[in-house]
Amino acid sequence: MPTMGALHAGHGTVIRAASAMGPVLVSVFVNPLQFGPDEDLARYPRSLESDLVVAERWGAAALWAPSVEQIYPQGGERHPSTIQVPPGLQKHLCGAARPGHFDGVVTVVARLLDLVRPRQLWLGEKDWQQLVILRWLVAHLARPVIVQGVATVREADGLALSSRNQYLSPDQRRMAAALPEALHAARGDGSDPIPALRGSLSDAGFEVEYVQRVDPCTLQPCGDETAISLLAAAVRCGSTRLIDHAFLMTRQPLVAIDGPAGAGKSTVTRAFAERLGLVYLDTGAMYRSVTWLVLERGVNPSDGVAIEPLLKDLDVQLQSLPGGVQQVLVNGEDVSSAIRSPDVTASVSAVAAHRCVRQALTVQQKSMGSKGGLVAEGRDIGTAVFPHADLKVFLTATVTERARRRALDLEQRGFAVPERAELEAQIAERDRLDSTREEAPLMQADDAIELVTDGMDIDAVIEALVRLFRERVAEEAWPTPQR
């Protein structure tokens, strides 16, 4: 956990969260490369003895306070191997007002990663731009490090904890509470929040450096077309620079998980939804339900004309039972087990290919997801059902791996298990049918992230999905439910 010291309860909260995953090393280093010529490098709070007490109290295993010479053997004033952050990530927000600041941040963190070689890098969400940039750094350097963010910690009046808060006089401290108050008020009526927020901050006596609304992932300016956006401000309270932000949400988070048959989408999506407090929309179960009804009524799965009348009074209900069990009802009948039979599996691709079926179920699915707050899995969720989802993942695995999983699933459900070669052939044929059908073929959305799950157990896949989600949706915007 990299810090510049002057540790407080905000740092402590990050330490405590990280300590649940293993021993935590807290580094304390006031990095000269991230300070501008007229900034507060010389007077930045330094309190190593106090930092030791705070770090130990919150659960750190060790604290490391290296010298400038240890971090920058070739000199810290102008380090020869300074890393350049992409312009797009530092063109706005703090990067615009502090040229070179984030180049200095990534340079020191890269050095710390080289020297410490941690498994995880824990950071606060308070400086969201820095968190996004450090995620870029880890990917850019291809380091095997997991980046974890922790929600902003605030005082009782809403002021975000910061080491620089100690610069504030008592009067300035009272005034500083107007910053989070104004940000919170700006989230209200749905109009452009920037003019009103800028006015409120000026009226409160702040010198406003910037007020901007950006996409939390790209850090580019945005408006209401972005369902989840970051409204950020930097002000001067006396001589002290304060930053803060709020997340604006026109709807709750929406996640689309697509992939071929047998990739394990249902299992991991259900657990992922429960982990993050999202509703699980099992679209695959909906198509299987229609397929079951088609077979039950003796209709040819390839005959779309004969299937269409069955859809007029169709009532598919998905209900979550205790223990994460899903109950599927078709016109009031419990078909939870029946829709997983080999006969349904063999016919679902043909039934799902009919335009009338996809249109009927897509309308239902879009209605369910209109307010967000859910994760849906299927074949065309990110391309046809929820093309504006906040996170799109294409979850897949090799045919061999999917055949192995299918055999295990059939065995556990008490069905006969075909030879592995036959299962592989069935899965390959299902892939061909799904990807070549005329109506909503299986395909990876252009902005979806491919996640190949060979060699990953369920927990590892869920953790990967959670990390992808948190890169787009902050803990502060959508808190993880307490278990």
Curated annotation (Swiss-Prot):
The keyword Transmembrane helix does not apply. InterPro entries: Cytidylate_kin, Cytidylate_kinase_dom, P-loop_NTPase, Pantoate_ligase, Pantoate_ligase/cytidylate_kin, Pantoate_ligase_C, Rossmann-like_a/b/a_fold. Keywords: ATP-binding, Cytoplasm, Kinase, Ligase, Multifunctional enzyme, Nucleotide-binding, Pantothenate biosynthesis, Transferase. The keyword Ligase applies. ATP binds at residues 4-11, 124-127, 153, 161-164. The active site is at 11 (proton donor). Pathway: Cofactor biosynthesis; (R)-pantothenate biosynthesis; (R)-pantothenate from (R)-pantoate and beta-alanine: step 1/1. It catalyses: (R)-pantoate + beta-alanine + ATP = (R)-pantothenate + AMP + diphosphate + H(+); CMP + ATP = CDP + ADP; dCMP + ATP = dCDP + ADP. GO terms for biological process: nucleobase-containing small molecule interconversion; pantothenate biosynthetic process; pyrimidine nucleotide metabolic process. It is found in: Cytoplasm. Beta-alanine binds at residue 34. Residues 247-483 are annotated as: Cytidylate kinase. GO terms for molecular function: ATP binding; CMP kinase activity; dCMP kinase activity; pantoate-beta-alanine ligase activity. It comes from the Bacteria. Its main location: cytoplasm. Catalyzes the condensation of pantoate with beta-alanine in an ATP-dependent reaction via a pantoyl-adenylate intermediate. In the N-terminal section; belongs to the pantothenate synthetase family. This is Bifunctional pantoate ligase/cytidylate kinase. It comes from Synechococcus sp. (strain CC9902).
